[in-house]
Amino acid sequence: MAKKTVRDIDVKGKRVLLRVDFNVPMENGRVADDVKIKEAVPTINYLIGQKARVILVSHLGRPKGRVDERYKMDPVARRLSELLGKTVVKAGDCVGEAARSAVAQMQDGDVVLLENVRFHPEEEKNDEKFARQLAELADVFVNDAFGTAHRAHASTEGVAGFLPAVAGLLMEKELEILGRLLTSPERPFAAVVGGSKVSDKLGVIFNLLTKVDTVIIGGGMANTFLKAQGYSVGKSLLEADKIDLARKLIAEARSREVKLLLPVDVVVAPGPAPGQEQRTVPVDQIPAEWMALDIGPESIRLFTEALRAARTVVWNGPMGVFEMDPFARGTEAIARTLAELNAVTVIGGGDTAAAAKKAGVAGKMTHISTGGGASLEFLEGKQLPGVRALLDK
């Protein structure tokens, strides 16, 4: 169901509570990476242009429901001011007198950033009274925080019970691009799934089996699938309680005639640390005391060949311990291959985005999702609470 967006309503002179995802990394009291802030700028600028009063609310870090100096929003307000080229007033709190008085002094086109919403334990409990206090600051609620749309929190879902709620421009873009993957992808459609844990991704793979032509599995999670096929994986990361599910998934892929590709060779070492001896072995020769830490050159060849035929690719999760150069080749090869494709390429998840950035090809992707967990749940076919709460068109 298509959701109403900020373009579908009149916001002139209105107080607009805009939920953004400003959960950015900090270093020495400065914003270390401002990508998430930049992603919100189009919606903020649209609202300023429409002469709305823009009240921003976000969380930052995990302050555990109490005030924590390290997670105050002041550095974010400073960086946002620079990006917008105008003053952003930082309120002393997100509810109560400090928030109310900051909002009361606003003129049309002004921007106020409320203090970290997670300084209050009620936020993550989706407390109704707290949601009402947030809602009382505004006339309209706009959710532009796709990254937290899978959380039913007061500032993502609760507040929508008290105000007309619509999607921001970033939220709209995410829902449109990810939605198209599930409903009308250009074929052949391939999914590349990696990362360390099968448990995080099983639901996604099962759902994607009904949509895709090819599934490529790498990273630590591939070990569980290799074990399910009878291979010994040495000391590699393994989720023994998921082996039966992996078997089921392999059978399901076969019955749906989806091509399922697993590594045929791996880079092994005694452990995930640099400077150790390492070698490449076929998957049936992983030494008993060693770990598989990346896909090998034959797997890279197999995977990239399959991807070259694709017209749509969704990628979530690295192929190995890509943070360490000796084990980054598989992930970087996938990133470079996607960058060269004449296809729709969508990346979900923080690690995968970081890997594309490390390979220097982030700008060549069609779309890098701003929501790791949210994009996974969306691709799993789940309804996201923060999206469900918005008005339908």
Swiss-Prot record:
Catalysis: reaction(s): (2R)-3-phosphoglycerate + ATP = (2R)-3-phospho-glyceroyl phosphate + ADP
One Gene Ontology molecular-function label: phosphoglycerate kinase activity
Stored SUPFAM superfamilies: Phosphoglycerate kinase (SSF53748)
Cellular component terms (Gene Ontology): cytosol
Subcellular compartments: Cytoplasm
CDD domains assigned to the protein according to its UniProt record, in alphabetical order: Phosphoglycerate_kinase
Entry binding sites for substrate: 21-23, 59-62, 118, 151
Pathway in which the depicted protein is active: Carbohydrate degradation; glycolysis; pyruvate from D-glyceraldehyde 3-phosphate: step 2/5
Keywords carried by this UniProt record: ATP-binding, Cytoplasm, Glycolysis, Kinase, Nucleotide-binding, Transferase
Keyword Nucleotide-binding annotated: yes
EC number(s) on file: 2.7.2.3
Residues making up the signal peptide according to the UniProt record: none
Gene Ontology BP, a term: gluconeogenesis
Subunit structure: Monomer.
Family indicated by similarity: Belongs to the phosphoglycerate kinase family.
Protein name, as recorded: Phosphoglycerate kinase
Organism: Pelotomaculum thermopropionicum (strain DSM 13744 / JCM 10971 / SI)
Taxonomic lineage: Bacteria, Bacillati, Bacillota, Clostridia, Eubacteriales
